[in-house]
């Protein structure tokens, strides 16, 4: 097969591993910067051009689209889809997952347990918003934040009011969430490919922090997950219509709670921690699903 990887930086670990895994299995691979793709949208002859040339047909496309370029990145991916390329995560699913509010609404509607959460733009009554999620301590986040950026633990009511008021001054959407103390700064990252959790790690926050993101200096170890955690991770990915997802779970006294569903999970931390060839599993999923029937359905 001919496979395109959409990424702004082909030197990143995840891109290199996906390219390596695809080549090892006999496929041709090209890494394309989605921002350098430009599209001819024409009912008679749509096409995608890249750095002065018209791109050939790709059997499959692997999107590694960063949050900052979600709009144009998903538009480029959508053009590949319309030309009959199989996407490892469809553009609409990526856009849905990047919308934290919509994601939580969809997960809640499917009965997937979440931390008690309130979302507001400019709350007229900060005190009522705090009460709505059970009071302090609580976590205040910017809805648009990623990798632990724009996330604050407010341990007292006064601190919570101050943080919310400060975020409100940024004209930003605010997410207020109960703090799961018993998780002790740890979460579980489950890597889902299709209908299987192929790997799981426990991520621990660095000392003095509560954010377990590896980008923020957290540490990781292999996690043994329960059947309930496995089931909720698969259900969360399926709810978001993602074939590949990183599902972050907190272990609360009342059971596992889904924190986030990531549409473009990094492979470095979880592959190096577990020793599992996740990139290879992703390529094998593509081999099973990038069929002629898919291309005909999408118009390729």
From Swiss-Prot:
Kindly give the SUPFAM superfamilies that the UniProt entry links to this protein: Glutathione synthetase ATP-binding domain-like
* Cofactor (UniProt): Mg(2+); Mn(2+)
Cofactor annotation comment? Binds 2 magnesium or manganese ions per subunit.
Q: Which GO terms describe its biological process?
A: protein modification process; SOS response; translation
User: What keyword terms does UniProt attach to this protein?
Assistant: ATP-binding, Ligase, Magnesium, Manganese, Metal-binding, Nucleotide-binding, Protein biosynthesis
> Which sites bind ATP?
141, 178-179, 187, 211-213
Instruction: Please tell me which top-level EC class this enzyme sits in.
Output: ligase
Positions bound to Mg(2+) 1: 248, 260
Q: What is its EC number?
A: 6.3.2.-
User: In terms of domain of life, where is this protein from?
Assistant: Bacteria
Q: Which residues bind Mn(2+) 1?
A: 248, 260
- Where along the chain is Mn(2+) 2 bound? 260, 262
Q: Which GO terms describe its molecular function?
A: ATP binding; identical protein binding; metal ion binding; ribosomal S6-glutamic acid ligase activity
Question: Which stretches make up the ATP-grasp domain?
Answer: 104-287
Residue sites binding Mg(2+) 2 per the record: 260, 262
Describe the applications of the protein.
Answer: This protein may find application in fermentative methods that use microorganisms overexpressing rimK for mass production of poly-alpha-amino acids, which is thought to be the most economical and ecofriendly manufacturing process.
Q: Which Pfam families match?
A: RimK, Rimk_N
Function, in words: An L-glutamate ligase that catalyzes the ATP-dependent post-translational addition of glutamate residues to the C-terminus of ribosomal protein bS6 (RpsF). Is also able to catalyze the synthesis of poly-alpha-glutamate in vitro, via ATP hydrolysis from unprotected glutamate as substrate. The number of glutamate residues added to either RpsF or to poly-alpha-glutamate changes with pH.
Family note: Belongs to the RimK family.
Q: What is this protein called?
A: Ribosomal protein bS6--L-glutamate ligase
Tell me the organism: Escherichia coli (strain K12)
């Amino acid at each position: 097969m001919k496979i395109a990887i959409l990424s702004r930086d082909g030197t990143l670990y995840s891109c290199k591993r996906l390219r390596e895994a695809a080549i090892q299995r006999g496929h041709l691979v090209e890494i394309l910067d989605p921002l350098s793709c430009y599209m001819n949208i024409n009912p008679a002859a749509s096409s995608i051009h890249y750095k002065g040339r018209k791109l050939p047909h790709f059997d499959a496309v692997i999107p590694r689209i960063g949050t900052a370029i979600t709009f144009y990145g998903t538009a480029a991916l959508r053009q590949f889809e319309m030309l009959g390329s199989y996407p490892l995560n469809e553009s609409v699913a990526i856009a849905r997952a990047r919308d934290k509010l919509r994601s939580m609404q969809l997960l809640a509607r499917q009965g997937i347990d979440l931390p008690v959460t309130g979302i507001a733009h400019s709350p007229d009554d900060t005190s009522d918003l705090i009460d709505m999620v059970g009071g302090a301590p609580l976590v205040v986040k910017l809805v648009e934040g990623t990798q632990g950026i724009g996330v604050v633990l407010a341990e007292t009511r006064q601190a919570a009011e101050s943080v919310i008021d400060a975020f409100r001054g940024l004209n930003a959407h605010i997410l207020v969430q109960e703090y799961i103390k018993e998780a002790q700064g740890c979460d579980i990252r489950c890597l889902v490919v299709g209908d299987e959790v192929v790997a799981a790690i426990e991520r621990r926050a660095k000392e003095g922090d509560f954010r377990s993101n590896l980008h923020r200096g957290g540490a990781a170890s292999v996690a043994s997950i329960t059947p309930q955690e496995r089931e909720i991770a698969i259900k969360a990915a399926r709810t978001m219509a993602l074939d590949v997802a990183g599902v972050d779970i907190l272990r609360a006294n009342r059971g596992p709670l889904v924190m986030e569903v990531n549409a473009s999970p990094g492979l470095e931390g979880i592959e190096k921690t577990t020793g599992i060839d996740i990139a290879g599993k992703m390529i094998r999923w593509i081999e099973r699903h990038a069929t002629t029937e898919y291309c005909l359905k999408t118009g390729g």
